[in-house]
């Protein structure tokens, strides 16, 4: 056993890197199973469960850090109570579905503990992360170019998600990692690679058909415009500033024209027609804002919150679960709210404690030296990446409770944390 443990400890980064490279393949396999065979629990799900068990083994029996073991015991105790509540307080519980949903949620805190542990005093090559991102993007870009990808929506709206299943999940994953890769290309002045990447990135965003990734891309774009403008003003390079502003205006005009020919624009028109919006002022009602901006998520939250309020004290503390009165409960698709409602107050704290603690530390470190850090492209890109992940989790969901995405959230956060920690 000691030989096995020593081998794992020595090669854990390699093992984890292989697992990361498996993610696009697992997601494609899931998509095929769901689209073609309508099978919910797939071999991909099984592999992720096996890797979760491997993580538990590694943390408990290989590294043996008390703080990790205490946190894992807390997660396990909560999980047992959560399942007991589902059995005791529901007339017709679906245990299998509840376990599956629970595993999706505890994947984030456990993978965070794991990545913190293995990245401590070990080097992780970020190029591997960028390579995985490019694999994901290629499996969206190529199928969309040849019109052989799966539809982003089952009906009504347009868009293609390549060979993947969820437009929100794949859009969030790409949006979160992209700022760091862009910063790498900008810092190393790899202009040709940057242009090619941005063209592919832009095409993917516009053909996915979803709104949130566009918003995320705008945040990155605005940062670089501000960065350039402030630097040019500081250096009194007014001619370059005029050229930049002119280029920016032309780019915006060209983008507006280009967007009108994309599924993203078509979906906006479909949505506005559905809501019977005749003029811009018609949008500014609570009903239309909910439907157009939040995709009816506020209405879903209201319905689920009423169920939560009428539940017993144990369900308020440990969660409603995901199956009620013989059917699957409709998710709000705003991750923070879904975790709170379905996992309860205690579940919310346990699942998101390490996540929030890590983000708080990074933000605190960044804004403590905001003036200097703002002009540090790498650090600003890290903070932008976190802001994007928060927005995606809040606006579209399928980020924190989707293992295919949350594993990359864990990796990114730990990389960012270690980067800021090095300066202390």
What positions do the PLM features span?
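A membrane-periplasm/extracellular boundary helix in multi-pass inner-membrane enzymes
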Residues: 228-286, 308-311
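Aromatic-anchored transmembrane helix interface
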Residues: 45-50, 71-83, 93-118, 132, ...
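Transmembrane alpha-helices of multi-pass inner-membrane enzymes
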Residues: 382-424
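Hydrophobic transmembrane alpha-helices and their immediate junctions
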Residues: 64, 73, 191, 230, ...
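N-terminal signal-anchor transmembrane segment
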Residues: 1-61, 80-89, 143
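Alpha-helical transmembrane segments of multi-pass inner-membrane proteins
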Residues: 127-153, 165-230
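Long extracytoplasmic/lumenal interhelical loops at the membrane interface
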Residues: 150-155, 161, 288-346
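Membrane-interfacial helix-loop-helix modules of multi-pass inner-membrane proteins that assemble, modify
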Residues: 29-37, 87-95, 138-170, 264-274
């Amino acid at each position: 056993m000691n030989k096995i443990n020593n081998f794992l400890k020595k090669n854990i980064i390699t093992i984890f890197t292989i697992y990361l490279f498996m993610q696009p393949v697992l997601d494609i396999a899931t998509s095929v199973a769901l689209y073609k065979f309508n099978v919910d629990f797939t071999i991909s799900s099984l592999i992720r469960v096996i890797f979760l068990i491997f993580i538990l083994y590694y943390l408990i029996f290989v590294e043996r850090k008390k703080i990790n073991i205490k946190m894992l015991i807390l997660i396990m105790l909560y999980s047992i109570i959560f399942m007991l509540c589902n059995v005791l307080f529901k007339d017709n519980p679906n245990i299998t579905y509840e376990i599956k949903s629970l595993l999706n949620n505890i994947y984030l805190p456990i993978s965070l503990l794991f990545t913190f542990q293995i990245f401590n005093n070990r080097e992780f090559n970020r190029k591997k992360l960028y390579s995985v991102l490019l694999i994901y993007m290629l499996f969206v870009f190529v199928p969309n170019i040849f019109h052989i990808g799966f539809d982003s929506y089952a009906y009504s709206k347009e868009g293609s998600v390549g060979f993947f299943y969820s437009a929100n999940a794949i859009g969030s994953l790409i949006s979160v990692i992209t700022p760091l890769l862009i910063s790498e290309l900008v810092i190393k002045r790899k202009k040709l690679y940057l242009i090619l990447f941005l063209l592919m990135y832009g095409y993917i965003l516009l053909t996915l058909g979803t709104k949130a990734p566009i918003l995320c891309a705008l945040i990155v774009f605005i940062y670089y415009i501000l960065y350039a403008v402030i630097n040019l003003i500081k250096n009194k390079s007014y001619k370059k500033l005029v050229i930049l502003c002119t280029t920016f205006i032309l780019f915006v005009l060209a983008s507006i024209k280009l967007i009108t020919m994309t599924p993203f624009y078509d979906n906006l028109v479909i949505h506005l027609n559905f809501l019977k919006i005749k003029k811009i002022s018609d949008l500014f009602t609570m009903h239309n804002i909910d439907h157009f901006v939040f995709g009816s998520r506020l209405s879903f939250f209201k319905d689920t919150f009423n169920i939560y309020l009428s539940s017993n004290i144990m369900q308020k503390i440990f969660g409603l679960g995901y199956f009620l009165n013989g059917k699957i409960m409709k998710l709000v698709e705003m991750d923070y709210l879904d975790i709170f409602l379905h996992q309860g107050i205690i579940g919310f704290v346990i699942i998101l404690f390490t996540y929030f603690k890590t983000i708080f530390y990074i933000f605190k470190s960044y804004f403590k030296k905001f003036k200097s850090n703002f002009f540090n492209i790498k650090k600003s890109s890290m903070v932008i990446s976190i802001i994007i992940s928060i927005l995606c989790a809040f606006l579209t969901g399928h980020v924190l409770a989707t293992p295919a995405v949350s594993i990359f959230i864990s990796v990114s956060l730990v990389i960012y944390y270690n980067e800021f920690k090095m300066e202390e």
